[in-house]
Regions:
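Second-shell loop/turn segments in exported
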Residues: 114-123, 150-156
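Right-handed beta-helix
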Residues: 133, 168, 203-205, 253, ...
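Sec/Tat-exported extracytoplasmic proteins
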Residues: 137, 169-172, 365
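Assembly/oligomerization scaffold segments
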Residues: 1-115
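Short beta-strand-centered interaction patches in the first periplasmic/extracellular domains
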Residues: 100, 107-109, 144-241, 245-247
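An acidic/polar, Gly/Ser/Thr-rich interaction patch typically located in mid-to-C-terminal regions
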Residues: 31-59, 213-418
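Glycine-rich, acidic and aromatic/proline-enriched surface loops and short helix-turn segments
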Residues: 98, 106-112, 123-143
Length: 418
């Protein structure tokens, strides 16, 4: 029985260090792409079976450019991206003239980041500064549909572009107090957006998992396969101890303004913040009935930080150096980012290149029902619901295309009751 291919390698055009072009698509037996919501670049790996002695005839020296053209046959989407060979790994000499190895690739933006330093002043919103920095230094474009709140005047002191972008992103906040992320996707390229925008997205797809881990051959209809979570595992459920130590549910900040000679102490309140911001689901993860020594968990603020306004220090966490709303950026962004991963699940689904990090999915999990429990509910109402895609591994091999992704949420679909 022949394999029905789910992707097509249209072209893998390699340009050597001296400008010689070679089409090597017939040597590629596997492609792996990695996206992360916390990474400004994607990673790519090409698995090669080389019977043409490419490694010597080109030769491969880690100074080559690759133009990649891949078609996703599950959706019809086409991917065209430029990469550079970063390294040659896992080299195994086979019989005769055959060799196997992996080409690890980096994006064109990654290469520019490695070659340039930013020494420049930027004035305006964080989103405008990142857009300009991406264009001028990474020679690329970034998709953004919103303006960050507040104006900054900053001087980047000989940093690589990615470091400058990371520094700026940490200081970005939306009009409603959501933090920003800067990331790269296989299909859409660079994106700069806030969690306010992410949470407002329509559900990209609904995935259903029924019973135990479903074998990859169980669903024989394409439509069913594209909506099936073939396998899932819970990576983390809250880890309350770690998040309490990080101040995810309560913390305080000492704000010292040298210029005005003032001192202020402000606190973060999880309960108030949860009600103020839109969330993936309706109910908070931390129960208002849970107490420690007769106090709610959210009433403790044992995690303290100090912020010096108008400080001359540049490379510090004193986020208010260049913006008078820095304390709110720090006090609201950090706890929120810790909360975004209170529930983490890794799952395997059918591959599609339009599924990227930053998308919102709906995940329905069938509940485990002991025979002693009589209920008409088929789904786990706590675990089921909306999730944000945080990490993705696109795996194309032997004609098959699967995605292994990490998804996360910070709220529950059902309130915990007695």
């Amino acid at each position: 029985m022949s394999t029905k291919f789910e992707y097509s390698i249209e072209s893998v055009l390699l340009t050597s260090s001296v400008g010689k072009e070679s089409e090597i698509k017939d040597l590629v037996v596997g492609l792996d792409f990695y996206e992360s919501l916390s990474s400004p670049y994607i990673k790519c790996e090409l698995s090669i079976i080389d019977a043409a002695n490419l490694i010597e005839s080109v030769p491969l020296l880690g100074q080559e450019k690759i133009k990649l053209h891949v078609k996703d046959l599950n959706t019809g989407n086409t991917i065209k991206r430029d990469f550079y060979i970063a390294s040659i790994n896992n080299y195994v000499k086979g019989n005769g003239q055959t060799a196997m190895y992996v080409l690890k690739l980096v994006t064109a933006e990654y290469m520019m980041n490695s070659l340039l330093l930013v020494s420049q002043a930027f004035t305006g919103t964080i989103s405008d500064s990142i857009t300009k920095l991406t264009k001028d230094y990474l020679k690329s474009t970034v998709k953004t549909s919103e303006k960050s709140n507040g104006d900054y005047k900053v001087i980047i002191p000989n940093w690589n572009p990615y470091k400058a972008i990371e520094w700026l992103t940490l200081r970005g906040i939306s009009s409603k107090g959501y933090p920003f992320v800067f990331y790269d996707t296989l299909k859409d390229g660079l994106v700069f957006e806030s969690y306010e925008t992410i949470y407002a997205k329509s559900i990209f797809n609904k995935y259903v998992h029924r019973g135990g881990n479903t074998a990859k051959d169980d669903a024989d209809q394409k439509a069913a396969m594209m909506n099936t979570a073939l396998q899932y595992d819970i990576i983390e459920m809250s880890n309350t101890g770690k998040n309490v130590l990080r101040g995810a549910f309560g913390q305080g900040m000492h704000v010292i303004d040298h210029s005005n000679r003032t001192y202020n102490f402000i606190t973060y309140d999880y309960d108030k913040d949860f009600k103020k911001k839109d969330r993936l689901d309706k109910f908070p993860y931390i129960s208002d009935q849970f107490t420690v020594n007769n106090k709610k968990l959210t009433e403790y603020d044992a995690v303290h930080s100090t912020l010096y306004k108008n400080s001359l220090a540049f490379d510090t966490n004193n986020l208010n150096n260049y913006n008078n709303k820095g304390e709110f950026t720090k006090l609201e962004s950090d706890p929120f980012m810790y909360q975004t991963g209170l529930v983490k699940i890794t799952m395997t689904v059918k591959g599609r290149t339009d599924l990227t990090v930053g998308k919102v999915i709906d995940f329905e999990v069938e509940r485990n029902r002991p025979v002693s429990v009589n209920t008409s509910k088929n789904s786990n109402e706590y675990l089921s619901g909306k999730y944000v895609v945080q990490n993705i591994h696109h795996k194309m091999e032997a004609g098959k295309y699967y995605i292994v992704m990490d998804v996360a949420k910070e709220s529950l679909g059902k309130k915990v009751k007695k």
